[in-house]
Curated annotation (Swiss-Prot):
Superkingdom of source: Bacteria
Annotated SUPFAM superfamilies: DNA repair protein MutS, domain I, DNA repair protein MutS, domain II, DNA repair protein MutS, domain III, P-loop containing nucleoside triphosphate hydrolases
Keywords assigned by UniProt, alphabetized: ATP-binding, DNA damage, DNA repair, DNA-binding, Nucleotide-binding
Any one Gene Ontology molecular-function term assigned to this protein's record: damaged DNA binding
The name this protein goes by in its record: DNA mismatch repair protein MutS
GO biological process, one term: mismatch repair
Gene3D superfamilies: 1.10.1420.10, 6.10.140.430, DNA repair protein MutS, domain I, MutS, connector domain, P-loop containing nucleotide triphosphate hydrolases
Keyword DNA repair tagged: yes
Length: 868
């Protein structure tokens, strides 16, 4: 909605400044407008009210315009990034309207122009970004059977696309990438979960056209076709990429030289994990929103922020490309064997975030400290190359080459940039001494001013006889001679009064005025010269942007591999063996997170699955370790396929295409967020998508409904997974009846199902969980003991024991199972699987015998007989 001048006045009745403001605001009605006025960014009218509320800053008034007071709020320019970060975190977008040119030289109203739009997905400033998490902007396009995705990490200079063929796959990609801002065509009826996301921005549908997207990409990258990017035959990905690029150009309002290519990701290259699996495995965020005690929290010992971001990306996209993963394993092993990881790690401590610094160089927003950090990082390359040169690891040899030689750029920055430059270019002192003769001369003139002023003060005191006379300077009035009020009558006649204070008078002389003009001119010229030299440095570095980006990417990967080597040695992890044949054999496996946070020794357990043993039915008491066991094996598989060592004594892992989980309601990990419908929805997804190369975790299927319904569901799901999907399945259940599945045959052969259990023992009236997986089914549930441990009142537990004894006795007497007897005693729940009533049954229900005559009753009887 466009903001109109308040008070009902036309534009003609507003001041020139407010006319200028309303003209700028009319172009960006839905954004907050930061309107530069001197040392402040001001917001007016509705923007001011909104900003005052969101930022807790003062709402004031600035005179009036058109006869109406002007609501106003402002933030200082020197601290605006902190306020901007808070607004972006709240989902707001901001248009930055700057003063163009030198306000001091402007005749009349200074020119202003919107130079940039800052949105949640387009931030590049260091102060606004999360150091170890990508900030992504994404666009979506679709046809009936295809979704196109394009996303950009502007701060890191990455541009990627993908296509998926289902809404489930789209949801999985969104869960993996977690875009900060999402662009959707305005006319499409997108799923509800998409529309409710934070950061969704509707765009005109014609911007998502594949042909116009192709033309835009060709023009931007200066190409004749898109085959080099591998997207020539991907119209939906092209459409999304074109819409994304258009939005970036619209918001950034400048060249984007750091976006140099597009990467086409293929779903088949990676192990698929949907949103539920990522949530259940708590890769980097717990289900309660906390980031502590997650897999990433245990795994991440990277030194650099860019390494931390790459590790997070790897963790969310384990690869199916076994040769790529094996090369990572080999690189980690080579580092461990040669102690290379420790040597590299020490060097990495002095590395900066080159990836994001190079983006700011390309966008001309790099600050002096960015350039000095880049200088220091490039100066480390000779040492890093020396360390890597002796390695025989194929991957480390590739990374050695990718680092490149940047001696000339490093040497230039060493000569050109001061050792510890100021934060801002306008503070001066960024360019090192002896780099530029002209700058040195201007600085010398400015620096010699101090001695001149000391000499002048001494001479004037002696010639005037005024002991309190002193020479000073301030930014408003420039240089002055100050004399106290008591001696002001002694001021020489050639002194010209410049300023009157309460206790002193300030004067200027012709000599001091001439000196002031000379010095201030030298300072201004020195700053202008520094700015020119600084821009030249950015040009020089920018010309090497592509090889420098490859260098930063290599450093990031080295940091992650060093992290893997350090974790393997510190946590006693082993190198997994990736097999071509189908198997999942883990000896002495441990849960990486549980082991890291608990004080007691973690009890390791084995897992052995192969084509004739594809499912384990896991029974045992609650708290016995079933859920931990299932998750630890999924995490071990995931770690193996990102290139990490794993928490086990040995691990042989065959091809895996998906990791799928169904965690039941009531689990501590799920925090009671699941419902029976959600349980069935997630189970349905697994049954429809699991393959013979999938790893599936099923935890307590069926407990959200009645006992019979739940048991029937669990039985049917287990059979489907074992015989139809034929996937690797860990099936934890409290239904003891399912243990009989292992004894059945299927199509003349074994069922492929085996029983294992976790046990507990009672010792001194205490229940001790063994946390050790054993072959065979459990023989006790220990439900009442667990209830007592949970703190149920003793009287309640005692009553339960008596009731259990009664049920068991009645079961023995009637030769029916305890579960059947319990069901007979309980109120009956509607059967989920009851068949639909027959026509005869419906007709019978509709009869009202008391209202029928004998003849009508006979006719009804014949009709019923005909329906049978």
């Amino acid at each position: 909605m466009r903001e109109k001048p308040e008070g009902g006045k036309g534009m003609a009745e507003h001041t020139p400044l407010m006319k200028q403001y309303f003209a700028a605001k009319a172009e960006y009605p839905d954004l907050l407008l930061f309107f530069r006025m001197g040392d402040f960014y001001e917001l007016f009218h509705q923007d001011a009210r909104k900003a005052a509320r969101l930022l807790d800053i003062t709402l004031t008034q600035r005179g009036s315009s058109g006869g109406t007071p002007i609501p106003m709020a402002g933030v200082p320019v020197h601290a605006y990034e902190g306020y901007l970060a808070r607004l972006i975190a709240l989902g707001e977008s901001v248009a930055i309207c700057e003063q163009i040119g030198d306000p001091g030289l402007a005749k009349g109203l200074v020119e202003r122009k919107v130079v940039r739009i800052v949105t949640p997905g387009t931030i590049t400033e260091e102060a606004l970004l999360e150091e170890r998490r990508d900030t992504l902007l994404m666009a979506l396009s679709r046809t009936k059977n295809c979704y196109g995705l394009a996303w950009a990490d502007l701060a890191g200079g990455r541009f990627l696309v993908n296509e998926v063929d289902s809404e489930e796959a789209l949801e999985a990609e969104l869960a993996r990438l977690e875009p900060a801002e999402l662009l959707l065509p305005d006319e499409d009826a997108w799923p509800e979960y998409l529309q409710q996301r934070n950061g969704v921005r509707r765009r005109p549908p014609w911007l998502f056209d594949a042909d116009s997207g192709r033309r835009k990409l060709l023009a931007f990258f200066k190409l004749h076709d898109l085959s080099g990017f591998g997207i020539e035959n991907n119209p939906q990905a092209t459409a999304a990429a074109g819409a994304l690029l258009g939005y970036i150009e619209e918001t950034q309002k400048q060249r984007l030289p750091h976006l140099t290519s597009i990467t086409m990701e293929t779903v088949g290259e990676a192990i698929t994990m949907n949103a539920a699996t990522r949530r259940h495995l708590e890769l980097d965020t717990r289900v309660d929103g906390e980031s502590r005690h997650t897999l990433l929290g245990v795994l991440d010992s990277t030194v650099t922020p860019m390494g931390g971001r790459l590790l997070r990306r790897w963790l969310h996209r384990p690869l199916r490309l076994r040769e790529v993963v094996r090369q990572r394993h080999a690189a980690v092993g080579s580092m461990i064997d040669s102690d290379l990881d420790n040597k590299l790690r020490e060097t990495f401590r002095r590395l900066g975030d080159m990836e994001r610094i190079l983006t700011r160089v390309a966008l001309r927003s790099a600050r002096p400290r960015d350039i000095s950090t880049l200088r220091d990082s490039l100066s480390l390359l000779p040492r890093l190359r020396e360390l890597l040169n002796a390695s025989d690891s194929p991957r480390l040899r590739v990374l050695y080459a990718e680092l490149g030689e940047h001696d000339s750029t490093a040497s230039l920055l060493v000569k050109a940039v001061a050792e510890q430059p100021p934060l801002k270019l306008t503070d001066g002192g960024v360019i090192a001494p002896e780099y530029d003769v002209e700058l040195d001369e201007l600085r010398k003139l400015s620096n010699n001013a101090d001695q001149f002023l000391i000499d002048l003060e001494t001479r004037e005191r002696e010639s005037s006889g005024i002991s309190t006379l002193k020479v000073g300077y301030n930014r408003v009035h420039g240089y002055y001679i100050e004399i106290s009020k008591g001696q002001a009558d002694k001021a020489p006649v050639h002194y010209t009064r410049r300023q009157t204070l309460t206790n002193a008078e300030r004067y200027i002389t012709e000599e001091l005025k001439a000196f002031e003009d000379k010095v201030l001119s030298a300072r201004d010229r020195a700053l202008a010269r520094e700015k020119l030299l600084y821009e030249q440095l950015l040009d020089t570095v920018g010309a090497q942007l592509e090889p420098l980006k490859r260098c930063a990417a290599a450093l990031s990967e080295l940091d992650v591999l060093v992290c893997f080597a350090e974790r393997a040695q510190t946590l006693d992890w082993v190198r997994p063996e990736l097999e071509h044949t189908s198997c999942l054999h883990i000896e002495g496996g441990r849960h990486p997170v549980v082991e890291a946070v608990r004080e007691q020794r973690f009890e390791p357990n084995d897992l052995y699955l192969h084509p004739e043993r594809r499912m384990l039915v896991i029974t045992g008491p609650n708290m016995g370790g079933k859920s931990t066991y299932m998750r630890q094996n999924a995490l071990i598989v995931l770690l193996a396929y990102i290139g990490s060592y794993v928490p086990a004594s040995r691990a042989l892992i065959g091809p895996i295409d998906r990791i799928m989980t169904r965690i039941g309601a009531g689990d501590d990990l799920a925090r009671g967020q699941s419902t029976f419908m959600l349980e069935m929805t997630e189970t349905s997804y697994i049954l429809h998508h699991a393959t013979a190369q999938s790893l599936v975790l099923m935890d307590e299927i069926g407990r959200g409904t009645s006992t019979y319904d739940g048991l029937a569901l669990a039985d049917a799901v287990a059979r489907h997974l074992a015989h139809i999907n034929r996937c690797y399945t860990l099936f934890a259940t409290h239904y003891f009846e399912l243990t009989a599945l292992a004894e059945e045959t299927y199509e003349g052969g074994l069922s492929g199902i085996a029983n294992v259990h976790f046990d507990a023992v009672e010792h001194s009236e205490r229940l001790v969980f063994m946390h050790t997986v054993k072959d065979g089914p459990a023989n006790r549930s220990f439900g009442l003991q667990v209830a007592a441990l949970a703190g149920l009142p003793a009287a309640t537990v005692a009553q339960a024991r008596r009731r259990l004894a009664e049920l068991e006795q009645r079961g023995r007497e009637s030769h029916v199972s305890e579960i059947t007897q319990l069901e007979l005693d309980a109120p009956q729940q509607c059967n989920l699987f009851a068949s639909a009533p027959s026509a005869a049954q419906e007709a019978l229900v509709a009869l009202h015998p008391d209202e029928l005559t004998p003849k009508q009753a006979l006719e009804a009887l014949y009709r019923l007989k005909a329906l049978l």
